[in-house]
């Protein structure tokens, strides 16, 4: 790891932990040249996951799109920015597990199901908004079934 202060290439880790909420590792490092300390957070690279669309075409998975879709349905909340970030992180952890067993691919349908599952437990209003906005061919009967 390169020191962000002096750009020296040798640093040592003197404290390391798995974070409770994130799928990441927190590390406290010290530069061997200048002696300054800094913190890093290491997580898996999401660009290795591919999303299979409805037309069977694969495109890179985008955390930004996931977060924006959650933000757009939770704008009634005072903490919608922070909530969208943490929900996206929770959903992403589940998507990693899906992708691991399927050649690093996830379907659009599985992403939508994970988002709906998370929103259903977190915020009913956001769940209904997401369901009506992103579910194709949603009718009144199906909506009632989802709300039970």
Stretches with model-predicted labels:
Residues 32-48:
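Short metal-binding segments enriched for Cys and/or His
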Residues 43-148:
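Charged, amphipathic alpha-helical regulatory modules used
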């Amino acid at each position: 790891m390169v020191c962000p202060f002096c750009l020296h290439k040798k640093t040592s880790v003197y404290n390391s932990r798995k974070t409770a909420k994130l799928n990441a590792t927190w590390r406290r490092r010290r530069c061997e040249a200048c002696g300054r300390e800094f913190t890093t957070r290491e997580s898996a690279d999401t660009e290795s996951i591919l999303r299979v669309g409805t037309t069977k075409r694969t495109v890179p998975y985008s955390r930004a799109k996931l977060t924006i879709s959650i933000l757009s349905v939770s704008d009634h909340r005072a903490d919608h920015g922070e909530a969208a970030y943490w929900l996206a992180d929770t959903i992403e952890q589940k998507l990693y597990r899906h992708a691991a067993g399927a050649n690093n691919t996830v379907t659009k349908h599985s992403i939508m199901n994970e988002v709906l599952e998370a929103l259903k437990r977190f915020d009913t209003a956001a769940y209904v908004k997401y369901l009506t906005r992103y579910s194709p061919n949603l009718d009144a009967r199906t909506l009632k079934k989802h709300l039970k």
